[in-house]
Every structure is written in structure tokens, then in C-alpha cells.
């Protein structure tokens, strides 16, 4: 894809003069865990965490051993409210979700260290839009979770056979407390209704 090559060239240029996150080997980590036909849920984020050691290519996820960020703590709280009795995870690595068919995709795949939103014009958005469009056309039925105005603006449209869920961003600064978000239970009900099986939202 020409826009992917453009984004990679711009990434290479910037990485020579600034620290870029996540590490290059993890930029496309979101492609490693499930085949397109096995994707059940898409959670769309904005850009990677901008502190060193956090981002590893999955939206909202951090490496093991890194403190769980406030946004992810709020996501975990919502999961527990959706499924009473669910254990609270002890870390913030969401690879288990990714292996179970949850695509954790940011609209920008890289960021300059310490500068949120700094790579929003790099060109990743066109790649992400193409990925979402192809999934919408060829996979599913799918559940799209769009948290916050940025994700909702970036998403575009999906076919009628998919379920699109919107809510405020899980950031503690958001107006609506994310703990009241029922997307996880809604997603499972939709997936089970369409014969795809719900997602196990536990993290081990």
C-alpha cells in the first residue's frame, strides 16, 4: 500500500532525530495474535502510550511489569461490573484479549516519546482506515468499540451486520465514568446471538 510505505519512510526519518514509541519491532504487533477471520471485536484507540516502556503495539495495553495506566484500570473496572465476580487483573498486558480475537488498534501506530498526538499526521490513519474497511467488508459479524470523540470521528462507517458501540474515553478525565460502560456484556450477547461465541474478557 503506497500510504503504508509513506508512513514507514516518515517513521524512519523521524526516528533518526527523536525517540519513537513503541519499538520498531512492535509497531505491527496487533497483526500477530489472530487471523482476520478470527477477529470478533475491534477496540479503536488513539495513539500509543508516550512514556518509555509502556507501549508494545496493542491499544490500551502495556508490557508486564509496568504499572497499569489509569485508563486501563477503568477498563478493568468496567469489565468487572459487566461480569460480577470476574477477577481483577494484576498486570496491564492485553495479549490474552488479542489471542481471543480482540483487535486492539490505535489510529496512530507510533508517537514521539513524551508527546501525545505527535504522529497523528504521519500517515498511519490511512492504513488503519483500510484495515477497518476490509474487516467490515469481509469479516464478521463484528463488534466495534469506539471510546471517545477521536475514535468515533476516525472510524467512519460499518455494514449493518456489525454492532458499533460508542462511549466516553476510559480516561479518568472523561465526563462519564467509564465503569458504567456495558460494552463487554453487549458484545458477548451480540456475538453469541450471531453464532460466533462471546469473548473471555479475563486476563491471566
UniProtKB/Swiss-Prot annotation:
<comment type="function">
    <text>Excises uracil residues from the DNA which can arise as a result of misincorporation of dUMP residues by DNA polymerase or deamination of cytosines. Therefore may reduce deleterious uracil incorporation into the viral genome, particularly in terminally differentiated cells which lack DNA repair enzymes.</text>
</comment>
<comment type="similarity">
    <text>Belongs to the uracil-DNA glycosylase (UDG) superfamily. UNG family.</text>
</comment>
<dbReference type="InterPro" id="IPR002043">
    <property type="entry name" value="UDG_fam1"/>
</dbReference>
<dbReference type="GO" id="GO:0004844">
    <property type="term" value="F:uracil DNA N-glycosylase activity"/>
</dbReference>
<dbReference type="GO" id="GO:0042025">
    <property type="term" value="C:host cell nucleus"/>
</dbReference>
<dbReference type="Pfam" id="PF03167">
    <property type="entry name" value="UDG"/>
</dbReference>
<dbReference type="InterPro" id="IPR005122">
    <property type="entry name" value="Uracil-DNA_glycosylase-like"/>
</dbReference>
<dbReference type="InterPro" id="IPR036895">
    <property type="entry name" value="Uracil-DNA_glycosylase-like_sf"/>
</dbReference>
<feature type="active site" description="Proton acceptor">
    <location>
        <position position="47"/>
    </location>
</feature>
<keyword id="KW-0378">Hydrolase</keyword>
<keyword id="KW-0234">DNA repair</keyword>
<dbReference type="GO" id="GO:0097510">
    <property type="term" value="P:base-excision repair, AP site formation via deaminated base removal"/>
</dbReference>
<keyword id="KW-0227">DNA damage</keyword>
<keyword id="KW-1048">Host nucleus</keyword>
<protein>
    <recommendedName>
        <fullName>Uracil-DNA glycosylase</fullName>
        <ecNumber>3.2.2.27</ecNumber>
    </recommendedName>
</protein>
<dbReference type="InterPro" id="IPR018085">
    <property type="entry name" value="Ura-DNA_Glyclase_AS"/>
</dbReference>
Amino acid at each position: 500500500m503506497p500510504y503504508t510505505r509513506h508512513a514507514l519512510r516518515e517513521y524512519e526519518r523521524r526516528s533518526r532525530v527523536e525517540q519513537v514509541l513503541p519499538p520498531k519491532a512492535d509497531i505491527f504487533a496487533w497483526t500477530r495474535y489472530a487471523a482476520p477471520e478470527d477477529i470478533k471485536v475491534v477496540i479503536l484507540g488513539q495513539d500509543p502510550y508516550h512514556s518509555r516502556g509502556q507501549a508494545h503495539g496493542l491499544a490500551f495495553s502495556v508490557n508486564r511489569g509496568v504499572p497499569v495506566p489509569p485508563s486501563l484500570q477503568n477498563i478493568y473496572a468496567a469489565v468487572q461490573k459487566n461480569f460480577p465476580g470476574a477477577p481483577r487483573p494484576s498486570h496491564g498486558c492485553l495479549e490474552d484479549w488479542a489471542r481471543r480475537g480482540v483487535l486492539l488498534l490505535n489510529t496512530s501506530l507510533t508517537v514521539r516519546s513524551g508527546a501525545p498526538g505527535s504522529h497523528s499526521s504521519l500517515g498511519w490513519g490511512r492504513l488503519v482506515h483500510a484495515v477497518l474497511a476490509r474487516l467490515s467488508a469481509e469479516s464478521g459479524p463484528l463488534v466495534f468499540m469506539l471510546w471517545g470523540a477521536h475514535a468515533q470521528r476516525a472510524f467512519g462507517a460499518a455494514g449493518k451486520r456489525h454492532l458499533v458501540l460508542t462511549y466516553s474515553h476510559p480516561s479518568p478525565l472523561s465526563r462519564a465514568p467509564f465503569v458504567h460502560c456495558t460494552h463487554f456484556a453487549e458484545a458477548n450477547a451480540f456475538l453469541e446471538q450471531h453464532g460466533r461465541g462471546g469473548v473471555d474478557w479475563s486476563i491471566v
